[in-house]
Amino acid sequence: MSNAESDFERFLTIEHCGDLLQQECFDLAKTSGWWTNIATGERLHTEESETPRINVPEKLCLIHSEISEAMEGHRKNLMDDKLPHRLMLEVELADAVIRCFDLAGGIG
């Protein structure tokens, strides 16, 4: 196998893992109610044929808030309040990644 073939196979594996993470984060978010309008109970997630009914700027601000919380944890050298054995920086960065994959899953 050539280096180019090996690199391509590695890319396909990484792409597949990214797809799996995106779907897992999106499915978990739907199950957790992140894709339901709190006021109306309307389902906000879409099927492939539908136009997304989400507020993308709101979702981006939620990602930004996780990054801001990570910065605060780093600046103050804090442990996480819900996972006290982990640094707040680690947990908030993981939350930001989850929200990124969730948004990507939601907009297709």
Regions found by a protein language model. Name each.
Residues M1-G108:
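Flexible "arm" and connector segments at domain edges
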